[in-house]
Structures are given as C-alpha cells and as structure tokens.
Amino acid sequence: MMGTMTMQTASPTRTARSAVPLDPALRSLRCEVARWALATGHPLNLDAIGVILAARHHEAIVEGRPFNRWTTNTVLTFLFGTAEEWCTRQHVTMPSHLGESLLTYVTFLAELDVLASGSSSIRQLQNTISDLAGLTATGHRRPARSNDVAVAPTPLRRGTE
C-alpha cells in the first residue's frame, strides 16, 4: 500500500490594511499622516504606514521607549528587523514602499515638532532612511537605469591550461 503525502503550506498572508489591528488612537494617527502626505505631496502607502504604526507601537511597549523617538539606529533595526518580524508574526505581507512611507512619517513627526527627546536630527533620519531604502531626495525610489546590467566577476588569476 502506498502512503499518502501531505503538504503543509504556510498560511496565506494578508495585506496590512485588512489585518493590522490598530487601536482608535493609531487609526486616527494613520488618517492624519495620510492627509498630511496628500496635502504636501509626500509618498505614502497605506499598508506600509499601518505596519509602521503597529510595529512601532509594539516595539515601544516591549522596549519601554517613547513611541515617537527615532534614531538612525532604530531606523536601521526597524527597516531590517522589526517590521519584517512583526509582519511574519501577524501573517501580514511585508508592504512595498516601507522606506518611502517611513521617510514621510518621520518628516511628518518633525514638521509637527513631536519627535521625542533623544531622537536623531530630522536631517540624519532622512539621510539614513534615504540611503537604506535607496530613495531620492524627494523620498521616491531611485529609477532603475537602463544601462544597469549584471556584472560578472572578473577572475583574479587565470587557470593554467
């Protein structure tokens, strides 16, 4: 008798907007950031800002730090750790445009003068996020250049024949 093989697949991920549980204060903040971004022409992805707010809220509680304190180090760990780990735990698809949305969010906080004490300067935050996420000075992704091609490594020594 032949055995049957069962396959387990990971549970499907959901978009952040359909799955991210934001309390009323965070929902209100998401709306305020979205209105500000629209009015000022800054890029913002609603799934990304939902993840930013929810993951940062969780991180602030766990670490016992102010929600609005952003440093160049927290930006790095957020973009390459916290957000992805939070999305995985919540079974939420990692949103595109996370870097652009984070840049818009910290700029929003700076414009309202609500970055917490101990935060890096807004210029440092903007430069760090732009560098890490590959963004232009206006906060958009750098366009791919048509002459960008994969470069094959050149061997250091030729084999003897």
Residue locations for each model-derived region?
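Acidic, proline/glycine-rich low-complexity IDRs
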Residues: 1-5, 117-161
